[in-house]
A protein has these predicted regions:
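A short beta-loop-alpha structural element at the N-terminal edge
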Residues: 33-45
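Conserved GNAT acetyl-CoA-binding A-motif
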Residues: 132-145
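A conserved beta-strand-loop-helix scaffold within acyl/acetyltransferase catalytic domains
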Residues: 50-111
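A short, internal acetyl-CoA/4′-phosphopantetheine-binding micro-motif in the GNAT/acyltransferase core
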Residues: 107-117, 145-146
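Conserved active-site alpha-helix within GNAT-family acetyltransferase domains
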Residues: 118, 122, 147-157
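Acyl-donor-binding surface of acyltransferase catalytic domains
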Residues: 1-30, 38
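Structural preference for long, well-ordered alpha-helical segments within the folded cores
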Residues: 127, 131, 154-155
Length: 157
């Protein structure tokens, strides 16, 4: 959950490609597995992101996802799912391209509150970074976060 009691400050973290390429494969907790986006998962992304306070309404979250990510979601979005294939955590990678600048980013890492504390955030973030560097070898990856996500900062170190 976001801790909005703190003043908001933007934080940019960078992982060099050599470090990202050496990350060990993620190991989700027993009863969970990681899978890529499949059509219809935009509603799960919206539910998960709203559950952690990133959006106030699922409809707004879904509209954002559809506008920004949907055309390439299968390449960029991963989920941690339960044994019943219910998504409970997500992470998205994105390549920002502006003029001749290209920057790989990890975005929207979230775990539903009922499933937090089981290492799922670390597992999904690691899986997303590993997948991104396979698709864009040699590129560093940025993570934009904020002080409201201070609990997650340990995860990103």
């Amino acid at each position: 959950m976001l801790d909005k009691s703190l003043p908001y400050k933007s934080i940019i973290m960078r992982m060099e490609a050599a470090v990202a390429e050496r990350l060990a494969p993620p190991a989700p907790a027993a009863g969970y597995r990681i899978r890529p986006f499949v059509p219809g998962d935009e509603r799960h992304w919206a539910r998960i992101e709203t559950s952690v306070g990133e959006f106030s309404e699922e409809a707004a979250a879904r509209a954002y996802f559809e506008r920004v990510y949907l055309p390439e979601a299968a390449l960029q979005c991963l989920f941690v799912v339960t044994e019943q294939d219910e998504p409970v955590a997500t992470a998205t990678t994105w390549t920002e391209e502006e003029a001749s600048l290209r920057q790989l980013q990890l975005q929207w890492v979230a775990v539903e509150p009922a499933h937090q504390g089981r290492g799922l955030g670390r597992a999904i973030a690691t899986a997303a970074v590993r997948r991104a560097v396979r698709l864009a070898p040699g590129e560093a990856i940025l993570l934009h976060t904020q002080t409201w996500s201070h609990r997650a900062l340990r995860l990103y170190r």
